[in-house]
Swiss-Prot record:
Name this protein carries in UniProt: 7,8-didemethyl-8-hydroxy-5-deazariboflavin synthase
Family: Belongs to the radical SAM superfamily. CofG family.
Pathway assigned in UniProt: Cofactor biosynthesis; coenzyme F0 biosynthesis
Protein's job: Catalyzes the radical-mediated synthesis of 7,8-didemethyl-8-hydroxy-5-deazariboflavin from 5-amino-5-(4-hydroxybenzyl)-6-(D-ribitylimino)-5,6-dihydrouracil.
Length: 352
């Protein structure tokens, strides 16, 4: 078991030897040499958000709320493409926007969650896709409601430091209060919801705050056991964002953080988005990642539209170059496919 002080020493140390020692440890553990991915369809239900993060291009004041028929059309096409995950995403607390609320009301819905529930239920009944929702902070009761129609859910912790709430990254984002995010991840644990979370590297956090964030995720998982994967995501600069001129984390920073995440989190899968790491993703296989996350043959990454997905053949090719077998998975990991973790109708659908 690696301690916080040992982790900090590792991040600060500039010699290659500690890295090589940790790599040997990781590669000894990962005897299966398997890396997974989920073939998905990314459905941006609505791109308004109450948060205005310094690194985000997803949010738009002139928002678009997808119509029910538009979402069904995407899902039908995704089914033809063989996708198994429907990633439903929208900005946090979109109901705070009166214009969004009015549009939903005209369509006969009391709010965005009722709208989401209906399309998720339709997805389960009419396609081979399984819903996975990531829409910001939700209450215990809201999580319980959506559990009925989701195979898994997600929320990035990003960082456990309250200090970042007063920085350019999160000063206009009340939903990025780490206490709110930790509470939601814990509530998902109480409700037995298979969960994806992660950390964001390069938004002004210190090395200590990176380590604290990973240990916080470990604490939650040891208590509830619901965290199926952790994303180690690198900040990427984009034109016309407040953080446009911020320095991106170096490949070595990412490499070290992936190594630590794998050693600290042990049996939790570690994911790095391949579209944000096209030049370095292959090297991160050696650092301990065992999942590429969602990759879509149909839709773009609406959060990072400038970064196209690699095609599955490309993923397979550079996974094999390092001796890794690429394996498709569902949005819920195999060890969570059980009555304890899934609503009955979702479990039955998976087992068919």
């Amino acid at each position: 078991m690696i301690t916080k002080s040992e982790a900090l020493d590792f991040l600060k140390f500039n010699s290659i030897n500690p890295i090589l020692e940790k790599l040997e440890d990781i590669n000894t553990r990962n005897s299966s040499k398997t890396i997974t991915f989920s073939k998905n369809a990314f459905i941006p239900v609505c791109n308004w958000c109450r948060n205005v993060c310094g690194y985000c291009t997803f949010r738009a004041e002139d928002f678009k709320l997808l119509k029910m028929e538009e979402m069904k059309e995407i899902l039908i096409k995704a089914d033809v493409f063989g996708c198994r995950e429907a990633l439903f995403t929208f900005g946090e607390n979109v109901d705070e926007n009166e214009k969004v609320k009015e549009e939903l009301k005209k369509m006969g819905y009391s709010g965005i969650l009722e709208y989401l529930y209906e399309i998720s239920a339709w997805c389960l009944e009419n396609t081979n896709l399984l819903p996975h929702t990531n829409c910001g902070i939700l209450s215990y009761d809201e999580l319980k409601y959506l559990r009925e129609v989701n195979a898994s859910m997600g929320l990035m912790l990003e960082n456990s430091s309250e200090r970042l709430c007063s920085t350019i990254a999160h000063e206009k984002s009340p939903g990025k209060d780490p206490n709110l995010r930790i509470e939601m991840i814990e509530n998902a644990g109480k409700l037995k919801i298979p969960f994806t979370t992660g950390i964001l590297i390069g938004i002004g956090e210190t090395l200590e705050e990176r380590i604290d964030s990973i240990f916080e995720i470990k604490r939650i998982h040891e208590k509830y056991g619901n965290i199926q994967e952790v994303i180690v995501q690198n900040f990427r600069s984009k034109p016309k964002i407040p953080m446009e001129n911020y320095k991106e984390p170096s490949p070595v920073e990412m490499f070290k953080m992936i190594i630590l995440s794998k050693l600290i989190l042990e049996d939790i899968s570690i994911q790095v988005p391949p579209n944000l790491n096209r030049e370095t993703g292959q090297l991160f296989l050696m650092a301990g990642i065992d999942d590429w996350g969602g990759v879509s043959p149909l839709t773009k990454d609406f959060v990072n539209p400038e970064a196209p997905w690699p095609d599955i053949e490309e993923l397979n090719s550079f996974s094999k170059e390092l001796g890794f077998n690429l394996k498709e998975r569902l949005p819920v990991y195999e060890k969570y496919i059980a009555e304890e973790w899934l609503d009955k109708k979702i479990l039955e659908k998976i087992k068919k």
